[in-house]
Amino acid sequence: MMFVARCGRPMRSLVPLLVVAAGAGRLAAQGIDQQARTRSGVVAAAHPLAAMAGRRMLDEGGNAADAATAAAFAVAVVLPEMNSIGGRNQILVRHADGTVSGIDGTTQVPRDYDPATAPKADHGYATVGIPGVVAGLMRLHKEHGSLPLAVVMAPAIEYAERGFRMLPGQERNHERVAEDLAETDGARRSFIRPEGGTYRAGDLLVQRDLAKTLRRIAADGGESFYRGDLARTMAADIQGNGGFVTRRDLADYRAETSRVVRGTYRGYDLVGLDVPAAGAVTIQALQIMERFDRASMSAPGWAAVTAQAIRIASGELGGLGSDSAALRATSKDWARRMAETVRLPGMGPAAATAGGDRPDEEGHFTTHIVVADSAGMLVSLTQTVGPIMGSRAATKGLGVHYAATLGGYLSSIEAGARARSFVSPFLVLKDGEPFLVVGAAGGSRIPAAIVQVISRVIDDGMDVAEAMAAPRVFMPSDTLIEMETSAPGWRPAAVEAVRGFGFRVRAVPAPGSFARAQVLRFRKDAGEWEAVSEPDDEGMALGAVRRAPR
């Protein structure tokens, strides 16, 4: 293969500054593993404290829904640049009995919003939609959890109230939007230091206002957030600063049941969620790739096929939204027809594909959590605020900052609609049994990362750590393929080979530029889970100590 050998990118042993104030010794600075193997439950998340929150629930006898809810609330505290309780989520659940369901906690456009007359802002209150994270997590816990909500939310409340130490990557992200954060009282109070400027790596970020809000949610199951005094405060703040969300919008919001979409890839069952998520895109890309023989192709040839398959499938996102559209997009016949448009090596210069040009509307600022418990429940959960820090507007006194949904961000989205994106919580099953639990952060690159990890495992026989470390490709336009060259990336010979196929090629050495995945694999022969958190990120994978949920 024309990239660094299968030992791959080394999994980091992070020593981040994770000490939580007020003597929480269990979170003292320590080496952080990005992979784990266990016969018990397991969790992987993009921040060590979120993974610890999830494992804490498993160790207390909770199930995967408890762990995912805890990790999701926790990550909303410790990765505010990526997500928030004022944001959106998509949740895919495989139950212990083998059934699958989905929860749509996507932000929704307010009823009085008119895209023709609304400001085309790229941040601020005018971009704020109706938040869905709290409703999504409340539904996940109420319908599938087993521990008391106060127990499940305790880690997030602790992190907000006592504080956590900023990681190096967070410092860079917060600094990028410092001026925008300083524009509103709430965001300035939450994320700007008293002496000015954003928080640095190692600084203790305390969010006491957010802690109070989380306590209210834990006490009343989110009722105050959508229909009580918290809702009244949020609506007054948003409307008073040029936004559109009203108390009625908040009161009427519901986390909806997602349409589950299915497909197959080389004998494995694929399961995802339809729009607003991009499960059908991920399935179609894999089913296009299934039309080609991996064993007969070089690594550069397979990279070119993979990039095109993802590009073609991604063009489907705008046309999805009905049962018939989902069935067409995930059908083998449609994959066959789309595969005929893929250019194989030696076919001459690249021309336009079915994909068209698309903006990367989610940016790279999203987070993902994967959880499995020993009883067979699996959760794959994506949570986001859209671009970095979302709207960059927060309600003072509540500590809640909001996702960007409206205005210049998603432009022509209509009242009542939910913001569709490339988020793709995903499952791979073999003979009805768990095989992979996967998802990623990274905007339009999310399906690309998921598809390539799955292909590396199934087609190349890699374990998850190898598949995660292997270099990725992405096709941002009809004739351009980007290739990851940060070590251990694609070698120059591979880059030149793809260029020789007739594509323009851009070598991208920046780590983390090809999405950031979280993956679990069940090894049936060993009866154990293998978990890996993205090696280009600062996350963590942890196995539970307790063997079974209550």
Indicate where each model-derived feature is located.
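Internal maturation/activation junctions in enzymes
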Residues: 293-384, 398, 509
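Extended C-terminal subregions enriched in glycine
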Residues: 303, 319, 375, 417, ...
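Bacterial N-terminal signal peptides that target proteins for export
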Residues: 1-15
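Short beta-strand scaffold segments in enzyme catalytic cores
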Residues: 83-95, 367-371, 425-427, 514-522, ...
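Noncatalytic scaffold domains of N-terminal-nucleophile
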Residues: 30-52, 56, 62-221, 225-227, ...
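Active-site rim segments in enzyme catalytic domains, especially the processed small/beta chain
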Residues: 77-84, 92-94, 99-101, 244-246, ...
